[in-house]
Amino acid sequence: MATTHAQGHQPVLGNDTLREHYDYVGKLAGRLRDPPEGGTLITTILFLVTCSFIVLENLMVLIAIWKNNKFHNRMYFFIGNLALCDLLAGIAYKVNILMSGRKTFSLSPTVWFLREGSMFVALGASTCSLLAIAIERHLTMIKMRPYDANKKHRVFLLIGMCWLIAFSLGALPILGWNCLENFPDCSTILPLYSKKYIAFLISIFTAILVTIVILYARIYCLVKSSSRRVANHNSERSMALLRTVVIVVSVFIACWSPLFILFLIDVACRAKECSILFKSQWFIMLAVLNSAMNPVIYTLASKEMRRAFFRLVCGCLVKGKGTQASPMQPALDPSRSKSSSSNNSSHSPKVKEDLPRVATSSCIIDKNRSFQNGVLCK
């Protein structure tokens, strides 16, 4: 009967394989609604706006690190890589939302695996990046050496390994580890994914997070028990970064733990038995919000990053105001030339030297304007 139903609605449903799997786990009716699964237009717009905000703020982090030479060191390379992961997570989830609902059934299984796999690649890269940061901090604390800017090979090696592991984990379903034509093994949250694959991913990510916690606990013990002060190698900056990263890891665990628990429930439950699995979009959104919180943590916890952010924003504002104020400059110049025309032509060099002072004094006189004649008043 299900087959007859599918044949009668082939132009609407599109792919039989996807329809059969969604029907088996009980998500077919929800996906035929736009927005899917009981969502409203407001929540869909909210999710899309959140994803756009995630992309924008993480792009600002990358630009700030790229433009500021102080951030061209190991730790900020890792933070930049984490920002790149968060940026890609925002893009991947936005694409996922736009391709959901009825559009799901117009996808081939390969495109479906790419759509869902991109989220797992971003998650894997984020988790591995946090592990790489913990490894780097641990090695630095053990050696107690100043940072050598010329030795960056370890940084890029760790970052490369992060992405290699992430792509490998995300590609497993499309390479064959899935539940196509094996319905009892299908996940309810991701109907083409094998429950064994999801259990494997959760175990991998949990092991990574436990390793991260152990490494930071060891770093803390090294700092407390060491007779040498960390001030011997730029400690203020180092400890500020350490606090920032610990906060990032804590927020990561808080945001992703509910989704991990939901996946474990998915592995344990049979199809259509656990109603909470049909509300997975809220758990996924909480996990994606982690990508929006990381740049906020960088800004609040690091003075250097906060200054870089403000410079970046103020620089854009100054450029925008400068282009608007530039047409007024020719109108002001003749007044100066008239006042200077009463003097002898022999005094013209002196007039040129005094011009910057006039611009500065006009800044001081008019305190109500922060930008005047192309000059930024402080």
From Swiss-Prot:
Q: What is its main location?
A: membrane
Q: Where is the composition biased (Low complexity)?
A: 337-348
Q: Where in the cell is it found?
A: Cell membrane
Q: Which GO terms describe its cellular component?
A: plasma membrane; presynapse
Positions of modified residues (Phosphoserine) = S326
What positions does the record give for glycosylation?
N15
- Record-stated family: Belongs to the G-protein coupled receptor 1 family.
Tell me the protein's name: Sphingosine 1-phosphate receptor 3
Q: Which organism is it from?
A: Mus musculus (Mouse)
